[in-house]
């Protein structure tokens, strides 16, 4: 294995599917696609206008591309008065939990449960462009509900999302897949993004903790303690047992002038490894630009780290 091929394993998750509704979900790059009923299911095309079809013949890469979204263009309810979901045991959705699946050349595997899930990264939001369309679990997306899309959590599941920059948190019900834009951890509904201050900026640094409603008294994990210090945003490019490989990578990154390069020794599952990171980075836009430069060097996609 070449020295630069070490790094972190790809995350995991599921797909969408289905039929039942009246709107076709737009791709995250674009436009709604309508398909004749008989073209996929072998039924009469006369009923096609009455039924929803998620066109599975299209590659996932055409369905989920990160583009600009928009806020509501009509009256906006008072987000402060909206009620957060109460976590409860629900059956696993028949749709949206296929595992593994591939989007934009990257493979994902659906987690069996939200229990123990605790990740930090970048949150984005999706709003008006998807409002009223089917989610991956074939529910109707409501941007005024406290919901979210995850590439790895099972559908449906619950999580507490905390904005690490201001300490605000919200309980969300995960019922959709995404985001598949590089460096994103979770997509929040418009309401959830407003509740914790991700909107109007559009992105933010968050911690996502899975909720297990099967464990009485432990349904709601406490939000993390947020200090006044602004959380640091980094890109982890590799972690190596061989220190020479780590040092070579660090030198290559420094020569490319991608930003401050940090090399540190850490314990991972009882093993001592040397970690190579770029950062801290000033904001999400800078992280996206640096990530693209690193991939352009022929290196694996770096992983976002928030400390």
Language model segments and positions:
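Conserved Rossmann-like nucleotide-binding pocket used by diverse enzymes
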Residues: 15, 236, 277
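Detector for methionine-enriched segments
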Residues: 1-3, 143, 297
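Intrinsic disorder/low-complexity segments enriched in polar/small residues
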Residues: 3-6, 220, 263, 304
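Sec-dependent bacterial lipoprotein signal peptides
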Residues: 1-19
């Amino acid at each position: 294995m070449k020295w630069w091929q070490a790094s972190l394993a790809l995350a995991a998750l599921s797909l969408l599917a289905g039929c039942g509704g009246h709107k076709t979900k737009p791709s995250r790059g674009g436009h709604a696609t309508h398909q004749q009923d008989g073209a996929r299911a072998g039924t009469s095309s006369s009923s096609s206008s009455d039924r929803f079809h998620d066109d599975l013949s299209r590659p996932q890469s055409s369905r989920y591309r990160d583009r600009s979204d928009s806020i509501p263009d009509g009256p906006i309810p008072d987000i402060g008065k909206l009620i957060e979901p109460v976590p409860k045991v629900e059956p696993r959705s028949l749709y949206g939990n296929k595992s593994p699946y591939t989007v934009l050349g990257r493979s994902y595997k659906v987690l069996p449960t939200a229990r123990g899930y605790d990740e930090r990264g970048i949150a984005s939001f999706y709003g008006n462009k998807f409002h009223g369309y089917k989610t991956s679990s074939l529910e109707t997306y409501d941007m005024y509900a406290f919901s979210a899309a995850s590439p790895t959590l099972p559908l449906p599941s619950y999580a507490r999302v905390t904005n690490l920059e201001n300490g605000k948190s919200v309980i969300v019900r995960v019922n959709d897949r995404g985001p598949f834009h590089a460096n994103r951890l979770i997509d929040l509904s418009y309401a959830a993004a407003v509740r914790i201050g991700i909107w109007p900026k559009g992105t933010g640094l968050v911690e996502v903790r899975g909720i297990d409603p099967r464990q009485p008294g432990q349904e709601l994990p406490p939000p993390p303690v947020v200090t006044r210090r602004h959380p640091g945003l980094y890109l982890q490019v590799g972690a190596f047992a061989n220190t020479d490989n780590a040092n070579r990578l660090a030198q290559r990154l420094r020569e490319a002038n991608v930003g401050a390069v940090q090399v540190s020794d850490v314990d991972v599952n009882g093993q001592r490894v040397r970690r190579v990171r770029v950062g801290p980075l000033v904001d999400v836009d800078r992280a996206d630009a640096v990530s693209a430069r690193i991939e352009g060097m022929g290196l694996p996609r770096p992983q976002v780290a928030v400390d």
